[in-house]
Design a protein with these regions (language model features):
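Bacterial Sec-dependent signal peptides at the C-terminal "C-region" and cleavage site
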Residues: 8-22
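Sec-dependent N-terminal signal peptides
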Residues: 1-9
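Mature N-terminal segment immediately following signal peptide/propeptide cleavage
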Residues: 18-48
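Enzymes and membrane/adaptor proteins characterized by extended Gly/Ser/Thr/Asp/Glu-rich
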Residues: 46-182, 201, 206-215
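Phosphate/pyrophosphate-binding betaalpha-module
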Residues: 190-199
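Conserved Rossmann-like nucleotide-binding pocket used by diverse enzymes
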Residues: 9, 151, 198
Length: 215
């Protein structure tokens, strides 16, 4: 599955003379069992040089050199060092590393240099579905510029419980039809500009009264 996702994300990196399906199968066939298992692993890390001890950075590079890593969950970064670190990792990797991040409120949520966008409920409150598309477009263009391929967003929970402490304004609305309309436009804004989307969370999460991160 991960190889197929990489095929979608890195489509522009494959020479036109190569068949995309053939590239995917050839890449998979060349991997050892350990390397295939490694492709199923996602490594979470900050990509700020100040947060990474030398020994941790060397450990990551050793993982890439030995068996590879399938994905990298991007926590926090900065323009001055993150791109250099990502380029180093991608260059050393036998298979392109799929980089993901949880970006609901714009790239600013992970990169101080990024654009901060309104919560989803505020976007829906504008009454203009095209605004959701434009926000998705902004998020996608900025994310791709810093090497991110996959966004863990949007939130498609229906906020039908006013006592919900964790979904609230992260949802587009308490109306399922509004959530569907605006989430679809946001997803199209991401995908049309080269960023994978994730519709989350669990069914019914909008009707809870506890924080799922701590309960």
């Amino acid at each position: 599955i991960l190889i197929l996702i990489l095929l979608f994300v890195f489509n522009g990196c494959i020479p036109p003379s190569l068949n995309k399906d053939k590239w995917s199968q050839d890449t998979l066939d060349k991997l050892t069992l350990r390397e295939k298992i490694a492709q199923m692993m996602i490594y979470r890390m900050n990509l700020r040089m100040k947060d990474i001890p030398v020994e941790k950075w060397e450990e990551i590079l050793e993982l890439i050199d030995k068996d590879g890593i399938g994905g990298l969950h991007f926590w926090y970064g900065e323009a001055s060092t993150s791109l250099t670190m990502l380029n180093t990792m991608q260059t050393r990797s036998k298979v392109p590393i799929l980089v993901d991040a949880d970006i609901e409120h714009g790239l600013h949520q992970r990169f101080p240099e990024g654009t901060e966008v309104p919560p989803f409920m505020a976007i829906a409150a504008s009454g203009r579905p095209e605004n959701a598309y434009e926000v998705g477009k902004i998020v996608a263009k900025e994310s791709r510029a810093v090497g991110i391929h996959w966004n863990f967003s949007p939130v498609v929970d229906v906020n039908n419980n006013p006592n919900n402490p964790i979904i609230n304004v992260r949802s587009f609305s308490e109306d399922p039809s509004v959530v569907s309309l605006y989430a679809t436009q946001y997803i199209l804004g991401l995908q049309d500009n080269g960023l994978l989307a994730t519709a989350k969370h669990f069914p019914g999460h909008g009707d809870t009264e506890t924080d799922s991160h701590s309960s």
